From Swiss-Prot:
Species of provenance: Saponaria officinalis
Family matches, as InterPro entries: Ribosome-inact_prot_sf (IPR036041), Ribosome_inactivat_1/2 (IPR017989), Ribosome_inactivat_prot (IPR001574), Ribosome_inactivat_prot_sub1 (IPR016138)
SUPFAM superfamilies with a match to the protein in the record: Ribosome inactivating proteins (RIP) (SSF56371)
Pfam annotation, one family: RIP
Annotated gene: SAP4
GO MF assignments: rRNA N-glycosylase activity; toxin activity
Presence of the UniProt keyword Signal in the record: yes
Signal peptide per UniProt: 1-24
Protein name: Ribosome-inactivating protein saporin-4
EC number(s) recorded for this UniProt protein: 3.2.2.22
Amino acid sequence: MKIYVVATIAWILLQFSAWTTTDAVTSITLDLVNPTAGQYSSFVDKIRNNVKDPNLKYGGTDIAVIGPPSKGKFLRINFQSSRGTVSLGLKRDNLYVVAYLAMDNTNVNRAYYFRSEITSAELTALFPEATTANQKALEYTEDYQSIEKNAQITQED
């Protein structure tokens, strides 16, 4: 009887851990302090290689074609400078920005995100530095018109 109880508990623990695992987040960084053309080229190549599907080709060329996400839903891009780091959260399947992380004037990491594109739990996995209390959903949507309106600019500017 004890073996059945142990087996059942082990099965529940394994199932629970499978239910709660989050995709690992890939982070790619560009150091903006004295960057070189080679560093920038390497940075762009890392992004391309991370999202491309090696089995997809465009017109028989070696141009990277975005494949379905196989390494997690999001990609973290960090831009480092002498004054700090700004991080972008990108959707892996289209490279759209869904969130960003920056330190505010009080040295607190704050994450801002499009609620329709990423959940708070996914944001926590992407930017663990920003606690749930320091996450803020943006008050506008991710389409260009909404962003322009919120920034108070137009395409003519």
